[in-house]
């Protein structure tokens, strides 16, 4: 009996020692897979985007909504963003209408103002953003799961306040992001979700809070990783103001 108990104890210890190694292997697989994406394969795609912003200050409420569809093409000559004649016409009409009625809705203008290059690049270069998160994140655990009917691995990570850069930590008192990344058997990202919240103070007297929830699914085109679907909700409050925003975007390859 003593021999059996000792064998069980040794087996448990062996399995416990294997768990961190397995986690490290999956994280390593992801990091190595990201290096393979040189982000140089030419592509063209259609982007459909929408945004809704709701802000409140005292008794005043302001709701802005926007939606637009445009094409992007990236090759050796650079990035080309093409707006259709219909979209450009709608923006021109909204500008003229706004002159007559400052409260008139301007959905096309709102969408294009919101989806500038920095926002579009989130769809076009997720490798950069994932690698940035991994530099700050601490691995919590890994699961073997099924994603769209195929075997996958799910990494659970956390980004605490102390892992942020000095500039990012500025004015923050509390911060935490829980990050999930689904990868396939080779380590290629399939999807991700980041849920975060934080609070802090400006000038020692103005307190603020914020939260966000961002979901992404990915696709590959040659040696390029792209965001196929993005869904984001976020909110902040402070100095008597509350703001909530919801964004959705989809990217569909044309070639």
Question: What do the PLM-derived regions correspond to, one by one?
Answer:
Residues 1-8:
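Positively charged n-region of N-terminal signal peptides that target proteins for export
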Residues 42, 150-152, 174-176, 185-191, ...:
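Coil-to-beta-strand transition motifs
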Residues 19-24:
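Sec/Tat signal peptide C-region and signal peptidase I cleavage site
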Residues 9-18:
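Bacterial N-terminal signal peptides
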Residues 25-176, 197-208, 238, 247-255:
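Structured extracytoplasmic
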Residues 193-248:
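Short aromatic loop motif centered on NTY/YTY
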């Amino acid at each position: 009996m003593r021999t059996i108990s000792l064998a069980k104890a040794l087996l448990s210890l062996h399995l416990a020692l294997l768990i961190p190694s397995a986690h490290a292997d999956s994280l390593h697989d992801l990091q190595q897979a990201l290096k393979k994406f040189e982000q140089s394969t030419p592509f063209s795609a259609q982007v459909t985007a929408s945004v809704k912003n709701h802000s409140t200050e005292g008794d005043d409420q302001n709701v802005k909504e926007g939606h637009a569809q445009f094409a992007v093409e990236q090759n050796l000559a650079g990035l080309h963003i093409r707006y259709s004649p219909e979209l450009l016409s709608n923006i021109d009409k909204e500008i003229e209408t706004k002159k007559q009625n400052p409260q008139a809705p301007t959905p096309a203008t709102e969408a294009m103002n919101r989806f500038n290059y920095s926002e579009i690049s989130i769809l076009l270069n997720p490798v950069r953003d994932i690698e940035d998160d991994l530099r700050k994140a601490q691995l919590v655990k890994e699961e073997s799961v099924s994603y769209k009917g195929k075997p996958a691995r799910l990494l659970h990570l956390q980004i605490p306040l102390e892992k942020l850069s000095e500039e990012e930590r500025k004015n923050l008192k509390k911060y935490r992001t829980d990050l999930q990344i689904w990868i396939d058997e080779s380590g290629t990202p399939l999807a991700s979700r980041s849920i975060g919240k934080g609070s802090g103070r400006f000038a020692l007297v103005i307190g603020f809070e914020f939260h966000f929830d961002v979901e992404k699914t990915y696709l590959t085109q040659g040696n390029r990783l792209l965001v196929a679907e993005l869904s984001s909700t976020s909110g902040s409050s402070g100095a008597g103001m509350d703001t909530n925003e919801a964004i959705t975007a989809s990217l569909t390859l044309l070639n």
